[in-house]
Regions:
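Hydrophobic faces of well-ordered beta-strands that scaffold small-molecule active sites
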Residues: 3-7, 31-33, 58-62, 89-93, ...
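Short, acidic/polar
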Residues: 11-23, 74-77, 150-163, 220, ...
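Conserved, mostly hydrophobic/aromatic
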Residues: 23, 27, 50, 81, ...
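Glycine-rich, proline-tolerant flexible connector loops at the mouths of alpha/beta enzymes
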Residues: 30-54, 65, 97, 172-175, ...
Length: 332
């Protein structure tokens, strides 16, 4: 199993760069950031500093969206970083939650996400595409490579992943939900004539190593609220039908709106509705052996990478614990 770290690009950017360097030294192979450039600093500027400070870390957004940047700009930015640092980027992409909503945009349609993945990948790898009834190709790219990993929860999103994406990002570490979503992605890939095993599976969730579970729950409760934004969209679309497992939908019944100014932050007041059970299921907490046990269960389901959100009050200790006690047991 590979390991990644997910950070918000809060100022000062040098702290983000330092943590990414520490993560690589601890055995992490991927460095991800949020991509909402109103709520946080512009990540692609910081990626250049991260790549310069590390030797092999693969860097990218978790996740960008089709509506945040012009697609040609996105492709050229990835291609420039790859040319400078040797194909060490990856593009996580979704419909757009915080990046869209804080500027008054709705999430993109799945068809738009599909088209964006194709255009950005082709451009970043040097192929010609049709844009606005014009053939476009970036002429200076040589041997470019960019994988597109798509995030999603609902049946149609999972189908889009299986049919078109290079990787699948599940922002939730509940094994029951992982089993259902991974199965749906692989079924869609198989039906489309693709190799299901060729799609990289990444589970992303907060992780906090320690013994004080009540405190850890309070620090990680924000994640249930963040996931709840996407679940609320699913419930609006599918209702209480069996199209989406109840393990994912039942807990948002008490949800009452969401304030993006606290997005992804410990102590988010919009997440008081999230019960302890959901924090325990969606996140990894407790001492190191509990993390190893959950990760082994996810690995048995076919998870190729675990990326941990490191937004709590004991980041350095958790990072060190993963490097010394957890990663070695999953990569041996």
């Amino acid at each position: 199993m590979d390991f990644g770290i997910v950070l918000q690009t809060d100022p000062p950017a040098r702290d983000v760069v330092r943590l990414m360097k520490d993560a690589e030294d601890a055995g992490f192979r991927y460095g991800w950031t949020f991509d909402s450039c109103v709520l946080w600093q512009e990540p692609f500027v910081i990626y250049s500093a991260i790549l310069a400070a590390t030797s092999s870390l693969v860097v990218g957004p978790m996740v960008t969206s089709p509506g945040t940047r012009d697609w040609s700009v996105m492709a050229s930015t990835f291609a420039t970083l790859n040319d400078m640092y040797g194909n060490r980027t990856v593009c996580g992409i979704g419909r757009g939650d915080s990046a869209h909503r804080v500027v008054g945009k709705p999430p993109s349609t799945l068809a738009t996400v599909r088209d964006c993945m194709r255009v950005v990948k082709d451009l970043a790898e040097g192929r010609a595409v049709e844009m606005n009834e014009k053939t476009v190709q970036i002429p200076w790219i040589r041997n470019g490579r960019l994988e597109m990993w798509m995030a999603g929860y609902g049946p149609k999103a999972l189908q889009t992943v299986g049919e078109h994406a290079d990787g699948f990002i599940l922002q939730c570490a509940d094994p029951a939900i992982a089993r259902w979503t991974i199965g749906a992605v692989r079924d869609a890939a198989r039906a489309a004539g693709r190799d299901p095993g060729g799609i990289t599976i990444c589970v992303a969730a907060p992780a906090y190593v320690g013994d004080d579970r009540p405190h850890q729950r309070e620090q990680l409760r924000w994640f249930g609220g963040m996931v709840g934004n996407h679940v609320a969209d699913l419930v609006a679309r599918y209702g209480s039908s069996s199209a989406v497992p109840r393990e994912l939908t039942d807990y948002i019944r008490e949800r009452e709106g969401y304030d993006y100014s606290h997005h992804g932050k410990a102590g988010n007041p919009s997440t008081e509705f999230v019960p302890d059970e959901i924090v325990d299921r969606f996140c990894l907490l407790g001492p190191a052996p509990a993390h190893v046990e959950r990760l082994q269960e996810l690995a048995e389901l076919g998870v190729d990478q675990f990326s941990l959100y490191l937004m709590h009050d004991d980041r350095e200790a958790t990072l060190a614990s993963y490097g010394s006690q957890i990663i070695p047991k999953l990569t041996a």
